[in-house]
Amino acid sequence: MTKVLVEPDPEEVKQLSEALGRQPVILAGICEAEYRGRAESVAGPALRIAMCKPDGTFILHNAMEKREPTNWNPAPSRQSIEVRDGCVVLRSRRLDVPEEVVVYFHKVLLACSLPKEGAKSEDSVFSLFRSEEDMKRVIREDPSVIEPGFRPVGEEVECGAGVADVVGYDEEGRFVVLELKRTRAGVSAASQLRRYVEAFREERGEEVRGILVAPSVTDRCRRLLEKYGLEWKKLEPVPLRDDGGKKQCTLTEFLAGEGD
């Protein structure tokens, strides 16, 4: 069951104790944190987000700064919530070594428990290209994902404007240049493809097609492609099971992309 509390009082937050260990629980607000274990540390008041996973994993992030967590405890750990002197105290204690993180929330802005249905990794499918090398592999193994009859003949091919990701021929024998983007493509991708096409056209003295291959493109990018006589091929990621057996994208990589 999902429960979302906006600017709750401490006693309301304490009710989420029942969900700890069974559902994902998230608290966000102004807090201080203490770590006690092999060393000791204190984090002063700041806006932070605390995440408690059912497997016992605990993570505390500063909401406005760097990607590394302020504190964290791996599983097996046990979390608890209590109210002390009007303050919400979230405690994470490791079960295998004597270490704990104690977070003192002076003001909780948001508290929620998430449904556990469909939350298991074996039920999820991770569908993001981890790199442009993944895209090349997909095209190499099945060139028809670009279009029927496409025949790739080279990767990382140099031209006067740089290095083209993939080149090949269509079923009519025309030379084709592919520019690959694993995330949403912007105008810079369209401009780069145009430069490659013009360079190959000048070097080869023949008609050259240019295709931007990406999961999606911005509106400005689409208009620029049309202006230059270039094409866009939507290539969906190959689903990868999030089973821990493959290297996953970081959040930074996931969010990276061209938004122009």
From Swiss-Prot:
TM spans (from-to): none
* Protein name (database record): Endonuclease NucS
Which CDD domains does the record match to this protein?
A: NucS-like
Q: What does this protein do?
A: Cleaves both 3' and 5' ssDNA extremities of branched DNA structures.
- Which PANTHER family has this protein been placed in? ENDONUCLEASE NUCS
Protein localization: Cytoplasm
The organism encoding this protein is Methanopyrus kandleri (strain AV19 / DSM 6324 / JCM 9639 / NBRC 100938)
Taking the first listed entry, what is the main subcellular location of this protein, grouped into a coarse class? Answer: cytoplasm
InterPro entries reported for this sequence: Endonuclease_NucS, NucS_C, NucS_N, NucS_N_sf, tRNA_endonuc-like_dom_sf
Gene3D superfamilies attached to this UniProt entry: 2.70.180.20, 3.40.1350.10
Query: What family does the database annotate?
Result: Belongs to the NucS endonuclease family.
Q: Which GO terms describe its cellular component?
A: cytoplasm
Q: Name one Pfam family in it.
A: NucS_C
Keyword list (alphabetical) reads: Cytoplasm, DNA-binding, Endonuclease, Hydrolase, Nuclease
